[in-house]
Amino acid sequence: MFLSSRTIFVGLCFLFVLAPCFTRATTNEVQVSCDSHNFNNGKHFRSCVDLPVLDSFLHYSYVRETGVLEVAYRHTNIESSSWIAWGINPTSKGMIGAQTLLAYRNSTSGFMRAYTSSINGYTPMLQEGPLSFRVTQLSAEYLNREMTIFATMVWPSNTTVVNHLWQDGPLKEGDRLGMHAMSGNHLKSMANLDLLSGQVMTTKAANDNMLLVKSIHGLVNAVCWGIFIPIGVMAARYMRTYKGLDPTWFYILIL
């Protein structure tokens, strides 16, 4: 009976030490990167970024000396009755002032429409209009529940960090662009993008910080009550029978 209990104790310690390793391995296996994507039109880009929300990816090629930025914003797992948008805000980190590229599929003809629109308020009509910088080769495609916008933009030379945002929403009757959702990831789809390194730096809101604190608190409780306390109790019960381990079992218990 004693040997069986001791075996259980050693097994629990073993699982506690190796569980994070198994978790990381599983996470790495299921993670999908934008590097493996091939475009149907044969386009190639030097860099790509897995955006943190809305099943989105940004592929781009940037020439710092000339300011030419060639992009492909790709939104996966999206219905054909939806619109997508990607934009850069040259003046702030928010929605107002964003210079956006939009696309949707015409409900009658089935052809894709891509155009530009400057956002000047919180309830924009997203009507077509010029941007504050030059845009060429604007197009879009929809295939296998995946919508993509292609464009080439010209920025001031030596621009390295930009504020960008991305979004999607429903397509209403008459191909009118409906309002995007006002909760969850739809309020988190904006970040700073370093065009040289490809690093995306998101801005966390107060609610996000509180959610993080709650998550950490729950994790600490689960580890303490589910792992440390049972190990301490078992150490105090079984290890103290060995005189050579005295007072090691006591220190394990109080830890």
Curated annotation (Swiss-Prot):
Q: What is this protein called?
A: Cytochrome b561 and DOMON domain-containing protein At5g48750
Signal peptide segment: 1-27
Q: What is known of its domains?
A: DOMON domain could bind catecholamines. DOMON domain could bind one heme b.
InterPro entries listed in its UniProt record:
AIR12_DOMON, Cyt_b561/ferric_Rdtase_TM, DOMON_domain, UCP037471
Q: Does the keyword Electron transport apply?
A: yes
Q: Where in the cell is it found?
A: Membrane
- Residue stretches making up the Cytochrome b561 domain: 176-255
Q: Which residues form the DOMON domain?
A: 54-169
What keywords sit in the KW lines?
A: Electron transport, Membrane, Signal, Transmembrane, Transmembrane helix, Transport
Is Magnesium a UniProt keyword of this protein?
no
PROSITE patterns the UniProt entry points to: CYTOCHROME_B561 (PS50939), DOMON (PS50836)
Gene Ontology CC annotations of this record: membrane
Per the UniProt record, which residue ranges are transmembrane?
216-236
Predominant location: membrane
| Coiled coil start-end | none
